[in-house]
Amino acid sequence: MKREVNAIWKGGGADGIGHLNVQSGAFSNMPYSFKTRFENENGKLGTNPEELIASALAGCFNMKLAFVLNEADFNP
């Protein structure tokens, strides 16, 4: 399976802005910036690339663990 992601960044580190796109369509043209690492435009918490990576790793770990447990005749 091949998946593509596009990340565009314009500007400096603290004042720049980027947009993320994923092939699956789960999100398209999603903005991210230094500010969204801590809050979004409404003052609520935002996301950041590290959080997205951690979410992907946690999801993969959970699925793999479920497969391993099933192979050992355990029902997770």
For each feature predicted by the language model, list its residue ranges.
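Extended beta-strand/beta-hairpin segments
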Residues: 1-55, 62-76
